[in-house]
Amino acid sequence: VQSDAPEVRTAAQSAIETIEGRLAVIAQFQNVWYGLSLGSVLLLAAIGLAITFGVMGVINMAHGEMVMLGAYTTFVIQELFRAFAPGMFDLSLLVAIPAAFLVAGAVGVAIERGVIQFLYGRPLETLLATWGISLILQQAVRTIFGPTNQDVSAPSYMQGGFEFLGLAITYNRLWIIVFTLVVFLALLAVLKLTSLGLQMRAVTQNRRMAASMGIRTGYVDAMTFGLGSGVAGIAGVALSQIDNVSPNLGQNYIIDSFLVVVFGGVGNLWGTLISALSLGVMNKFLEPYAGAVLAKILILVLVILFIQKRPRGLFALKGRAVEA
């Protein structure tokens, strides 16, 4: 039965506007969720860089390859489970996390001891050396595993999703956010509650004073680089669940990682957290209007303008410097 009564049309129009308004609100909250998800990925990729860059002042262009090594470690672990324990495949990620940390951490220590320790105070040479190392690692992985994407599967508890108040939430993104927070809190505990963390904070604030107090800055540098690289390897485990595992995986995140670290404040983990989540949400809100590429460009421009006004980032570390 159709009716042209004005009150019916008015009621229908009002109902349509209400529904459209509700859908618009849900879409905005969906963008926030996507932004937090992207921010957690950026945080995982950047948090290790925040440690090494903050303590050592080293621009490590091979940081993305530590992420890539973590992803390939996950692939190898899953292949071993498929071959020898297919019934326990859901445990593969739990095994891959410490394995990726050890592999990437060991490579990081080797890079610091073998190359970077001879280049402190020479930022251009360090940048070029680490860029060369990144190319070597990419080619080594490409030679061993091939140039094509590798199949890394999600365990059963990370498949599927659910709807909450109209929001579409996938389990893999949800688990990555939870995992990111756990890694972040674990790193805070290491920095605040351990002897190594105390020494790292001392070297970050004033390297010369720390050395004069008997802290072995060379040892701290090696352990810091290993810790930062290990955390990047853990990030690779998470990224293997949402991105293609290829030799170029790390290159997709290295620029964003530096952007997060510089925007948040070098060496400040809380600044890195807020920076990553903020940039992730901003990116997802800009994408519907500007597109994915232009959104990244706009964010880069905004960060550059912000750094010009506040060169030390959102949260600058406090410390006393000794002038030469």
Regions found by a protein language model. Give the residues of each.
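Conserved hydrophobic register position within alpha-solenoid helical repeats
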Residues: 9-16
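Loop-to-helix entry region at the N-terminal start of transmembrane alpha-helices
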Residues: 30-41, 92-96, 164-186, 221-222, ...
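Single transmembrane alpha-helix segments in multi-pass membrane proteins
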Residues: 32-77, 110, 114-125, 263-269
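Pore- or pathway-lining transmembrane helices of multi-pass membrane proteins that form conduits
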Residues: 65-69, 119-142, 249-262, 278, ...
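Alpha-helical transmembrane segments within multi-pass membrane transporters and channels
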Residues: 87-133, 140, 274-279, 310-311
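Transmembrane alpha-helical segments in multi-pass inner-membrane proteins
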Residues: 93-94, 98, 225-237, 241-303
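Cytosolic-side transmembrane-helix boundaries in multi-pass membrane proteins
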Residues: 125, 129, 144, 148-149, ...
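Helix-loop-helix "hairpin" substructures at the membrane interface of multi-pass membrane proteins
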Residues: 168-245, 274
